[in-house]
Amino acid sequence: MDIQNIKETIAMIEEQNFDIRTITMGISLLDCIDADIDKTAEKIYQKIVNKAGKLVEVGNEIGHELGIKIVNKRVSVTPIAIIGAATAADDYTPLALAMDRAAKEIGIDFIGGYSALVQKGYQKGDEILIKSMPKALAATERVCASVNVGSTKSGINMTAVRDMGETIKIMSKGDKWLNAKLVVFANAVEDNPFMAGAFHGVGEADTIINVGVSGPGVVKRALEKVRGESFDILAETIKKTAFKITRIGQLVGQMASERLNVEFGIVDLSLAPTPAIGDSVARVLEEMGLETVGTHGTTAALAMLNDAVKKGGVMAAERVGGLSGAFIPVSEDEGMIAAVNSGALNIEKLEAMTCVCSVGLDMIAIPEETPASTIAAMIADEAAIGVINQKTTAVRIIPMGKEGEQIEFGGLFGVAPVMRVNKASSADFIARGGQIPAPIHSFKN
């Protein structure tokens, strides 16, 4: 093996904030379905504990052996709206409590899958789950929720969009963490390892391991060595760096899969930032030559970064999947926070950036007086970008405080500056309900 490659890998880990962001075990709950909600809850608890009981231990073991920090060990489950629909219950909070109890028992920080897939309409379980979401998330610490409101094949369920705007507004009256644990998707993927949007798709194996990597600091350091060079060299440098990052993710996933005796799923090629200095996607874009993220050229820089990461990573992994792109969460990226505070970055520019990356308007604080219809309209805009461009888009917004204030989350969630929102009304638009039809180019058969 090339000694230079070994040195570069050591530097990635020791100096450039490289880590494995998450090992996520996906668990099918289809065999937990029961007409009695209490029996269903107990089956859910038992299956999660039995399947993922050693997940944290194995993750720590692998991290210690390889000398790599594995930040999170997590679990995703089959969308609970499907599981709960077999019961006569009108509230699925007991199932969320079972998930939370299992998460605490096995020592993971988050469990995803309190979810509903409603891109083309509601089944009984979907409506019950969405109505119970504020109560379920308030009653639990580690449960994450998601709702898929649109897809390229189905269009956008605008009734669900309206309902999610109202749900987010209701939850904003509670703890700030409630909306940080809820993602509204279009074109949601079934093998996403990242929270809060992870759920285990019904087309997946009974139990799988998916891995999410993190490496903005590594990419930035590599780009520092090619300052002033052409975009051709820039793209090639990102590709080579992404290959190394993904290769480690592949190794960790294989080791976890073998030791847990679980099928290996995918490596998610996403670049996921943290609030730490030197671990920012925004700073990578600035290293390309932008004075600050948010200025003209930001969308082009992000498009190239996203594409080059995929091209480099896809050769390094057996199977890639998940969201696989650069994440641009505002509160979780110190460069994004700085750009918002300086006035260089606004919601409209972030929306443009979501056209070319993963995932969407992520961890953004907006004024608490923002009406539910405006929140729903923001979701509709993001869903439209995803549906028309055949990609995953999402919204995770926190209505809290006044414009200019800072909402402190701490840890990996960082600080969210409260951003300006257009005050003109979208209420009549959102009140229509119904379905925006699928785009013409969705008809592929």
From Swiss-Prot:
Gene3D superfamilies with a match to the protein in the record: 3.20.70.20
**Of which family is this protein a member?**
Belongs to the UPF0210 family.
Q: Name one Pfam family in it.
A: DUF711
- Record-annotated membrane-spanning stretches: none
The record's annotation in InterPro entries points to: UPF0210
The record's section on NCBIfam families has: PRK05313.1
Annotated protein name in UniProt: UPF0210 protein llmg_1581
* Origin superkingdom: Bacteria
PANTHER family, alphabetized: UPF0210 PROTEIN MJ1665 (PTHR37560:SF1), UPF0210 PROTEIN SPR0218 (PTHR37560)
Q: Which organism is it from?
A: Lactococcus lactis subsp. cremoris (strain MG1363)
Assembly mode: Homodimer.
